[in-house]
Structure formats: C-alpha cells, structure tokens
From Swiss-Prot:
This is ADP-ribosylation factor 6. It is a peripheral membrane protein. Its main location: membrane. GTP binds at residues 28-35, 71-75, 130-133. One of its GO terms (cellular component) is plasma membrane. GTP-binding protein that functions as a molecular switch for the activation of 'new end take off' (NETO), a process in which the directions of cell growth change from a monopolar manner to a bipolar manner in fission yeast. Involved in supplying membrane to the growing new end. Belongs to the small GTPase superfamily. Arf family. GO terms for biological process: cell growth mode switching, monopolar to bipolar; intracellular protein transport; positive regulation of G2/M transition of mitotic cell cycle; regulation of cytokinesis; vesicle-mediated transport. It comes from Schizosaccharomyces pombe (strain 972 / ATCC 24843) (Fission yeast).
C-alpha cells in the first residue's frame, strides 16, 4: 500500500522539480554573432566560428528550463530554408549586429518575414542587439525603432543589448525568455 501511495505522488513531484523544455530558434543575418552566442551560453567560452552552413543545435539549461536552441545559418542563400525550422518554436532569438547600420534594414525585412509566418505567430521574440562593444553600435532604443518593433501587436518582445564575446546581456535574455515562457 505504501508503495502505491508513493507512486501516486512521484509523478507530480517529478514534474514539479524536473526541467521544462522550450524550443528556441536563433536567426539573424550572417555575421551577426549567432553561433558565438550559442557557444558562449553553452560552454561559457568564446569560440572561433566559421559561417554556419546548415545549423547547430545545443541544449542550454537556465533556471530549470532546458532551452533547445537551434542556430541556423544566416547567409542569404540559406534564409529561404529558415521556415523549415519554424514548427514547434516557442521563442525566436533574432540576433542583430548593432554596429552594422548598412544592413539593419535588411535585418528588419527578414525579421518581419519570419514573424508574419503563421507558425511563428505565438512565439516570444527576443532581439539580441549584439556587438554593443563596437563603436557606433545602435542602442536598444534605436534597434527598436529601426526594426519597427513598436508596431507589433499581440506579441511579447524584448530588445536586449549584448556582447557575445564577453557574454554581457546573454543571461538577461534567457531570464526574459524564462519569465515569459508559456511552458506546458
């Protein structure tokens, strides 16, 4: 009898204390810093990267949430394939090179194309305004303005200033995702 009583309690307790999972898609133009961010979060190290052809996927645990992060290459020839990764995505991390003002309108077009897809309708949007350590980097307020995020209705979004090389701002981004996640 005692054993069956324990079994009845073990399932709710395991759900209470186990890690929840959240599928995250990390996109952005090539050379924005996506892969550097992924491995800074995973290994807490800066790694030398090459342009991603295809994808990298890693699990990053933060405050008992397992973020399954899919980092997909950002070269223009690869971008049409992004939609194949949309299914099941709960959060979009869109990485912007804040110091590359020449490509910010291209980044805006790609972001709005992604979030207008019906499969991405309900996902959280975290914009990482990366490379804040570089001269001339746009501020989070400027990124918000240029990406026209204020026009987004019925979507939770946040702009987090980051520096992938030092890790500045990355954990704050995960904290925002974990606080706003609708985990099942």
């Amino acid at each position: 009898m005692g054993n069956s009583l324990f079994k009845g309690f073990s399932k709710p307790f395991s759900r209470l204390f186990s890690n929840k999972e959240m599928r995250i898609l990390m996109l952005g133009l090539d050379a924005a810093g996506k892969t550097t961010i992924l491995y800074k979060l995973k290994l807490n190290q800066s790694v030398v990267t090459i342009p991603t052809v295809g994808f990298n996927v890693e699990t990053v645990t933060y405050k008992n949430i397992k973020f399954n992060v899919w980092d997909v290459g950002g070269q223009d020839k690869i971008r049409p394939l992004w939609r194949h990764y949309f299914t099941g995505t709960k959060g979009l991390i869109f990485v912007v090179d804040s110091a590359d003002s020449n490509r910010i309108s291209e980044a805006r077009q790609e972001l709005h194309r992604i979030i207008s897809d019906r499969e991405m309708r309900d996902c959280l949007l975290l914009v990482l305004a990366n490379k804040q350590d570089l001269p001339g980097a746009l501020s989070p307020a400027q990124i918000t303005d240029v990406l026209q995020l204020d026009k987004l209705k019925d979507r939770l979004w946040n702009v987090q200033p980051t520096c992938a090389l030092t890790g500045d701002g990355l954990l704050e981004g995960l904290a925002w995702l974990s606080q706003n996640a609708k985990l099942k």
